[in-house]
Design a protein with these regions (language model features):
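Residues within mature, well-folded domains
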Residues: 1-129
Length: 129
């Protein structure tokens, strides 16, 4: 957890910024993950934009076909007074993947304000090898 306080004119301190990374329970992390991603599946993922992530593929839909990952991390950051941004990053890495399977997939998800549904906002993988 990272906190930043700003000193006020009367000598008191007010929270100016907060962020933290936390354990998550939506994705099963498997350090010996074996790739189950194809290029077609990766290409079928839709990225939402940061102002409205809800046009991106839902995390829950991806987890139906890919429930295990190499790594997953959940973070919360303040954006404005009283508002928090929730993000999830997931990586799938198998550098000895069998033919037809991807060696690496990295996905980043955001939520809409006041919503706990994660939507895909960024993906990278097969073209970056």
């Amino acid at each position: 957890v990272y906190l930043t306080f700003k000193k006020q004119y009367d000598g008191t301190f007010l929270l100016a910024y907060a962020s933290g990374r936390f354990p998550q329970d939506k994705v099963e992390v498997d350090k010996s993950y074996k790739s189950d991603w194809t290029k077609e599946q990766f290409d079928g993922l839709k990225e939402g934009d940061y102002s409205d992530p809800s046009n991106g593929t839902k995390l829950e839909d991806i987890l139906k076909d890919h429930p295990k990952a190499s790594n997953a991390e959940y973070s919360i950051t303040t954006t404005r007074q009283g508002e928090f941004k929730k993000e999830m990053t997931i990586s799938y890495s198998d550098y000895e993947a069998e033919d037809g399977k991807l060696k690496r997939v990295y996905l980043s998800f955001d939520t809409k304000e006041g919503d706990d549904t994660f939507y895909l906002t960024y993906k990278s993988g097969p073209d970056e090898d």
